[in-house]
From Swiss-Prot:
<dbReference type="GO" id="GO:0006750">
    <property type="term" value="P:glutathione biosynthetic process"/>
</dbReference>
<dbReference type="InterPro" id="IPR007370">
    <property type="entry name" value="Glu_cys_ligase"/>
</dbReference>
<protein>
    <recommendedName>
        <fullName>Glutamate--cysteine ligase</fullName>
        <ecNumber>6.3.2.2</ecNumber>
    </recommendedName>
</protein>
<comment type="similarity">
    <text>Belongs to the glutamate--cysteine ligase type 1 family. Type 1 subfamily.</text>
</comment>
<dbReference type="InterPro" id="IPR006334">
    <property type="entry name" value="Glut_cys_ligase"/>
</dbReference>
<dbReference type="InterPro" id="IPR014746">
    <property type="entry name" value="Gln_synth/guanido_kin_cat_dom"/>
</dbReference>
<dbReference type="GO" id="GO:0005829">
    <property type="term" value="C:cytosol"/>
</dbReference>
<comment type="pathway">
    <text>Sulfur metabolism; glutathione biosynthesis; glutathione from L-cysteine and L-glutamate: step 1/2.</text>
</comment>
<dbReference type="GO" id="GO:0004357">
    <property type="term" value="F:glutamate-cysteine ligase activity"/>
</dbReference>
<keyword id="KW-0317">Glutathione biosynthesis</keyword>
<dbReference type="GO" id="GO:0046872">
    <property type="term" value="F:metal ion binding"/>
</dbReference>
<keyword id="KW-0436">Ligase</keyword>
<keyword id="KW-0067">ATP-binding</keyword>
<keyword id="KW-0547">Nucleotide-binding</keyword>
<dbReference type="Pfam" id="PF04262">
    <property type="entry name" value="Glu_cys_ligase"/>
</dbReference>
<dbReference type="GO" id="GO:0005524">
    <property type="term" value="F:ATP binding"/>
</dbReference>
Amino acid sequence: MIPDVSQALAWLEKHPQALKGIQRGLERETLRVNADGTLATTGHPEALGSALTHKWITTDFAEALLEFITPVDGDIQHMLTFMRDLHRYTARKLGDERMWPLSMPCYIAEGQDIELAQYGTSNTGRFKTLYREGLKNRYGALMQTISGVHYNFSLPMAFWQAKCGVTEGEAAKEKISAGYFRLIRNYYRFGWVIPYLFGASPAICSSFLQGKPTTLPFEKTDCGMYYLPYATSLRLSDLGYTNKSQSNLGITFNDLHEYVAGLKRAIKTPSEEYARIGVEKDGKRLQINSNVLQIENELYAPIRPKRVTRSGESPSDALLRGGIEYIEVRSLDINPFSPIGVDEQQVRFLDLFMVWCVLADAPEMSSDELLCTRTNWSRVILEGRKPGLTLGIGCETAQFPLPKVGKDLFRDLKRVAQTLDSIHGGEEYQKVCDELVACFDNPELTFSARILRSMIDEGIGGTGKAFGEAYRNLLREEPLEILQEEEFIAERDASVRRQQEIEAADTEPFAAWLAKHA
């Protein structure tokens, strides 16, 4: 089932320097909660500056949903320490609030209790909040409070020069984009390994279902927790952060222009379902528009091709201008065993897996095959640790035992690990392979099995409160290592100033501005 990567691995072993200079970045979302686990109702803390313009600390869907962002970094330890500093400083500024350490929220009774993220009075700020109003009206506010970690990854130019002979210009843009699309296609085919190893949402609180019927065969504990005994990541299931209405958009990952055309089509395609919501009611705007996607960011995807946008530029226009610059991996649950929601083992694994995905042959995929890959993901998400579980290839009928496929993959990853270790010295990447490959013979070592044991004993609420309290105390006591308090204060003040400048520069009424952007 695993493609034959032996030739590409042999090439890599002859060109180890091609991997020198991998760049990464991390984003982590987390809900602010009170000591009893309920959602904080306070505004975004003033000490953290403006959520609209702060470089490192912002908000996602809700006013209480923090998002931490590291700068692009070539050093894993430095990146993780930077992320930890963001958590340390924030923990000191939250008063009695703490950061929820799980992907799935628990103590939220009603979607109406969730205040949308606020970004001030500028047209840009109001647009961001209106987009969130649309998400709430389309999918419900509760789904939008599910948290995750995003891992951004790019290969150095030296890799593309050695592998594809690229120089500069239009040809380089096309070849590099083609390489990243190969990575993405392999991710759709084999990325289920991420929830298998690191999924950490095998259960949900009963309040999350809100009385809605479900066909999933949940088991229920006395305290009202619903779980699937072999599940890995309900966050990635249809119960979690997905969008069924997008499954027939026909967006493919074979060619830059095709991909962008599909995305632009979805933004312009009217939706009967969303038209029923209405765009405006009693003078209040309910969504940006009633198209399948309000804006490009609404496209749900476990992985995204990205390029840093210029002012006023859409993500797809940035891709057309310069090609794919980096990849955003979006399938990581919050790691409940780390105070910052992600750890070094995960980052090193993702490095290895991304390199493997770009090396392995990946035939082009139709939108039908893309939908078929969902079958493997769904199996792993809902019953990944089940003994005897098998996986298929695309839409074919042949089945393969998951543990065998996983171990075959890790044989390749071990060779990538040896190459990366030869550049950096030490055996850190190989150690990660040795630790993680054991999860295929013993699923009890996976994140989902470990956290489920705690949840069955303590409930999701009890587990979340205990971990959150421990991490709050730990982070508040740890000294800052990279950033200094003065730098946080300077960025707070600068972000507030930037927001004020944006607001002062706005001369156009929001309705007129929106007419041009909706």
